[in-house]
UniProtKB/Swiss-Prot annotation:
RuBisCO catalyzes two reactions: the carboxylation of D-ribulose 1,5-bisphosphate, the primary event in carbon dioxide fixation, as well as the oxidative fragmentation of the pentose substrate in the photorespiration process. Both reactions occur simultaneously and in competition at the same active site. GO terms for biological process: photorespiration; reductive pentose-phosphate cycle. This is Ribulose bisphosphate carboxylase large chain. The disulfide bond which can form in the large chain dimeric partners within the hexadecamer appears to be associated with oxidative stress and protein turnover. GO terms for molecular function: magnesium ion binding; monooxygenase activity; ribulose-bisphosphate carboxylase activity. The gene is rbcL. It comes from Manilkara zapota (Sapodilla plum). Its EC number is 4.1.1.39.
């Protein structure tokens, strides 16, 4: 017979500790929890096999191809400190296994069937190294950080946003009114909530029209460029593009997409449309916690963030470190840097398993959003720096005097923090003092400080990994 039938251990073919990784390989770091009795080498090799060329038994057609050329390889395994029976398995994939310019195809292989594999109790993809040879096949973000600043004519500070609440139930007219008040007060952007699409109480076209009116009115009054993230997410790709086309016809600067619920194929199409038509693209990460919240299973958000930079988006939500949603400081800053820098060194203390060279792919602005208010402003300015979007939903609309004064309070707090930082003051230590000083000459800020003063913010405590 031409080949040897039967079942053999994965590790005989797919565990190759001597392998030297190539510059063109896609590298993955998996956190593997094997079932009792399964050795880690076998588990790591099984992951490499099932996410590349392998199947459960030797097949006749293996002889018609070159496994050595196409197989994934588990090239290193290390135990996870402090965890029983958990290992980091490093897997290298040859570039030819992936379709060019398709995040969808990359994920279908790397995080496809293998996650349901019986020999594993749990599996988590912690990080991916995307080689320039692959990232160069993607358009990436429609515009990137610098082009966005030029389009908006806003420099030297973080941008300010606000999600319009209540997220569901407002009519289009009242929704537009809320947008106008926030923009007039000094915000750069307002935002559709991620689940505002086109519901019976407010159809998308009506919302787009009233929000555009609000933008133009606020621009005329303030002399600043304003935007509202018009959510183009829809039930079909065709409908999504139709909404983006209408936004372009209205002349607004930015649209929005829920990239995980909408899917990577839809997102990449929208990103291409946005670059071709001069629209900025704001990305919301609804559903990410379903994938990334469990420590031992799923995918870390840094992988979803890298995937978004490939697929395309100019802003993406990235946790706050300080608000109501989860996000540890060093780890968050790790993937924030992966979003906006060209070159990020391997640094295990920040959860970065591989050095990532993005070459010239545009960067993405991280968005801090969720339970933040004026007392957080010094910390946010310090942690995220200038290249970020700070979004205060309740922290704007919850102001006792209304939306516009709420917006004023946030803008004054931000400008005060930026000025203090530029004068060399330590925002971590003097943050509360800086806000108090500014509130002496801004009654709007003083009122905001009073409302949220009980919600204490301890800056030092967040500094642990």
């Amino acid at each position: 017979v031409g080949f040897k039938a039967g079942v053999k251990d994965y590790k005989l073919t797919y565990y190759t500790p001597d392998y030297e990784t190539k510059d063109t390989d896609i590298l993955a770091a998996f956190r593997v929890t094997p079932q009792p009795g399964v050795p880690p080498e076998e588990a790591g090799a099984a992951v490499a096999a099932e996410s590349s060329t392998g199947t459960w038994t030797t097949v006749w057609t293996d002889g018609l191809t070159s496994l050595d050329r196409y197989k994934g390889r588990c090239y290193h395994i290390e135990p996870v400190a402090g965890e029983e029976n958990q290992y980091i398995a490093y897997v290298a994939y040859p570039l030819d296994l992936f379709e060019e310019g398709s995040v969808t195809n990359m994920f279908t292989s790397i995080v496809g069937n293998v996650f349901g594999f019986k020999a594993l109790r749990a599996l988590r993809l912690e990080d991916l190294r995307i080689p320039p040879a692959y990232s160069k096949t993607f358009q990436g973000p429609p515009h990137g950080i610098q082009v966005e600043r030029d389009k908006l004519n806003k420099y030297g500070r973080p941008l300010l946003g606000c999600t319009i609440k209540p997220k569901l139930g407002l009519s289009a007219k009242n929704y537009g009114r809320a947008v106008y008040e926030c923009l007039r007060g000094g915000l750069d952007f307002t935002k559709d909530d991620e689940n505002v699409n086109s519901q019976p109480f407010m159809r998308w076209r009506d919302r787009f029209v009233f929000c555009a009116e609000a933008i133009y009115k606020a621009q005329a009054e303030t002399g600043e460029i304003k935007g509202h993230y018009l959510n183009a997410t829809a039930g079909t790709c065709e409908e999504m593009i139709k909404r983006a086309v209408f936004a372009r016809e209205l002349g607004v600067p930015i649209v929005m997409h829920d990239y995980l619920t909408g899917g990577f194929t839809a997102n990449t199409s929208l990103a291409h449309y946005c670059r071709d038509n001069g629209l900025l693209l704001h990305i919301h990460r609804a559903m990410h916690a379903v994938i990334d919240r469990q420590k031992n299973h799923g995918m870390h958000f840094r992988v979803l963030a890298k995937a978004l930079r490939l697929s395309g988006g100019d802003h993406v939500h990235a946790g706050t470190v300080v608000g109501k949603l989860e996000g540890e400081r060093e780890i968050t800053l790790g993937f924030v840097d992966l979003l906006r820098d060209d070159y990020v060194e391997k640094d295990r203390s920040r959860g970065i398993y591989f050095t990532q060279d993005w070459v010239s792919l545009p960067g993405v602005l991280p968005v801090a959003s969720g339970g933040i208010h004026v007392w957080h402003m010094p910390a946010l300015t310090e942690i995220f720096g200038d290249d970020s979007v700070l979004q205060f939903g309740g922290g704007t609309l919850g102001h006792p005097w209304g939306n516009a004064p709420g917006a004023v309070a946030n803008r004054v707090a931000l400008e005060a923090c930026v000025q203090a930082r530029n004068e060399g003051r330590d925002l971590a230590r003097e943050g509360n003092e800086i806000i108090r000083e500014a509130s002496k000459w801004s009654p709007e800020l003083a009122a905001a400080c009073e409302v949220w003063k009980e919600i204490k913010f301890e800056f030092e405590a967040m500094d642990t990994l």
